[in-house]
């Protein structure tokens, strides 16, 4: 970033929650870096959407940085039990991706039943935000149960619970 001209287009891309470790990205530091170097920020929130933030709104919301995150993308296949995904960004970014992304151009639309499933799941999460907290509570319960049984687990604040199998 330091070597690029300030006016050059730059994009910092990160996972919101890393799928193998359950670690949450350092979004405050990333957005500050983006501010320093005039870069945009993109968060792939496949594992943060439905889990972190107010009512499961995701990693950017978790940190209060939704307004400093230029592109948020996620999947319906994890917390919404469907297929497909989403991208939230300024309209010109969405139009660019829609017209220039080969995988998007050559793929089929989400089936109506899958869209309805995702929408129904979103409505449940919105009506019952306590379910997100329950997921966190159940994750903590699982961690404690594994630890009591001597299973070595990696520290994580998300429902992703990495554990070591060694020679089991």
Give, region by region, the residue ranges found by the protein language model:
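Active-site PLP attachment segment
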Residues: 61-96
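A short glycine-threonine-serine/GTX helix/turn-capping micro-motif
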Residues: 83, 101-110
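Conserved PLP-binding catalytic core of the aspartate aminotransferase-like
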Residues: 133-140, 147-168
């Amino acid at each position: 970033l330091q070597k690029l001209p300030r006016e050059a287009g730059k994009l910092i891309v990160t996972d919101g929650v890393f799928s193998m470790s359950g670690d949450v990205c350092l979004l405050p530091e990333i957005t500050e870096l983006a501010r320093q170097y005039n870069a945009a920020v993109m968060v792939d929130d496949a594992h943060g959407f439905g889990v972190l933030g107010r009512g499961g709104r995701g990693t950017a919301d978790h940190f209060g940085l939704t307004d400093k995150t230029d592109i948020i993308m996620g999947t319906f296949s994890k917390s919404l039990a469907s297929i497909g995904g989403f991208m939230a960004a300024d309209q010109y970014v969405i139009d660019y991706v829609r017209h220039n992304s080969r995988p998007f151009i050559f793929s089929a639309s989400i089936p109506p039943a899958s869209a309805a499933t995702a929408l129904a799941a979103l409505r449940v999460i919105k009506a019952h935000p306590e379910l997100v907290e329950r997921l966190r509570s159940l994750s903590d319960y699982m961690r404690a149960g594994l630890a009591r049984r001597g299973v070595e687990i990696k520290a994580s604040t998300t429902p992703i619970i990495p554990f070591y199998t060694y020679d089991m």
